[in-house]
Amino acid sequence: MYISLHNHTAIGSNTRGFLDSINTVEKMVAYAKELNHTGLCITDHDSLTAHIDLLHHIKSLREKDPEKWKDFKPICGNEIYLTSKKNILEDKDYSKLYHFILIAKDEIGYDQLRKLSTRAWCDNSFTFVNIRTPTYFDDLTEVVRDEKGHLIGMTACLGRQCDRMIVEAYNLDQENPDYSLVEKWLRAMDKLFGHGNFFLEMQPSNQEAQILVNKVILELSSKLDIPYVITTDAHYLKKEDREIHEAFLKSDDNGDSREVGEFYNTTYMMSEAEIHSYMDEYLTPEEVQVGIDNTQLVYNLCEEYSLDKPLVIPYKAFDATEPSPELYAKYKDKVPLLEYFYNSEHDCDRHMCREILNKLEDRPEEFQNQPTYDALRDCLNAIIVSSKAQNTQWSGYLLVCKELIKTVWEAGSLCGVGRGSGGGFFLLYMLEIIGFNPLREEVKTFYWRFLHEKRASVLD
């Protein structure tokens, strides 16, 4: 059984202005299932962007077909650029940004991924300008040791430190290469993550360097008692997509600034048979199968968890005055949905009701008419449905926006009269968030572009 543990997506690995992958989460999941993989792990280049899409997509598939997808496990990881502060801050040696895979075993592990990625991006922004974001050994050590046992480490591709040390040692003495530095580094990483949470990584490839590394990893795995796994570092979906991926990589500068050829020949999602077809030429089928089966060790170590958080809208009552009972009695039949807000247990709902009633009363020529009542009905209904669907009160959001706009004007600054879909939501005009009446516009705008009861989502 096999799970692909090293994969890149277009949504995550291309975020740094560095063209990398053409994979989509949906197609990867579908193809992984077609190949009988037991799950999918996303490990974009220092980006956690695609994880929420992966978890949501698997959740939706399980809702449609629970039996088919119940054991298909989504796993979240990150391919970092591991280095020392000396390399970057003192030597300014940006070639020593070594690839390394981190995989979250659980929610605590995912929080550690977030901490490390945040530090890496901050160091990238304030230390030097580079499309690769450094994760320093010191930071990795600190975060992992704070709560040990929640992250899995894997040695990644040919861009990793141990691979470079293997190739350098071999080139120095091909007859009797000294891999002691590699062994020292691997032992240190195994100790850092905890034995059983660190894996050596092989990849199928026709490159001589990768074949050499795979052979040495086999020896070191046995010698150091560190298991190895086989990954494909997927940047595109299928073998026949190779030319499309190459054209994508060349689309910005024709590939002048990077290698776009040989390395990527085998970086696609593979079946077990395809992996064997590449690797059985220099390893035994049994040795290859061990690397395939060992991916299930990672599968078993990883729990499933949700990244969803409750939507919390902060609300401060700038005016705590309750709505007037007299005004409510006057307008409740004209705008029946006001009852929901007038009788609500939430302050923000009642305060918004107050604002609406006051506007209806203060500007009778503009607001006391049937088109206004109809527009209010549509807007209030959309807010009620959306608030219930998301277990929050969107009235609080609108009242805070109202105060922000008011503050801008009172400070003597300028604020745009409105933009986008909000320009069609009549209630925003009554709350003075936008500066024009949508009902008077010659070009018709629609409230449902901003919020609709059948599309209960976060507001613009």
Regions found by a protein language model. Name each.
Residues K85-I101, K115-T118, E272-E274:
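Acidic/polar active-site rim loop that often engages polyanionic ligands
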Residues K73-P74, N78, H99-E107, L220-V229, ...:
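Acidic, His- and aromatic-enriched active-site or binding-groove loops in soluble protein domains
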Residues D44, P74, D106, G153, ...:
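A residue-level signal for conserved active-site and pocket-lining positions in enzyme catalytic cores
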Residues M1-L5, S13-T15, R164, A169-L172, ...:
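Non-catalytic structural connector segments
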Residues L48-K64, I88-L89, E243-E246, Y429-R440:
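Glycine-rich loop at the start of a catalytic domain that most often binds anionic cofactors/ligands
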Residues F450-D460:
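A structural-propensity feature for long, helix-poor, extended segments
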Residues M1-I42, D46-K70, K115-D241, C348-V400:
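Domain-core and long-helix interface of multi-subunit machines
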Residues V229-K238, S413-G435:
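Conserved phosphate/anionic-ligand binding catalytic regions in large, soluble enzymes, centered on
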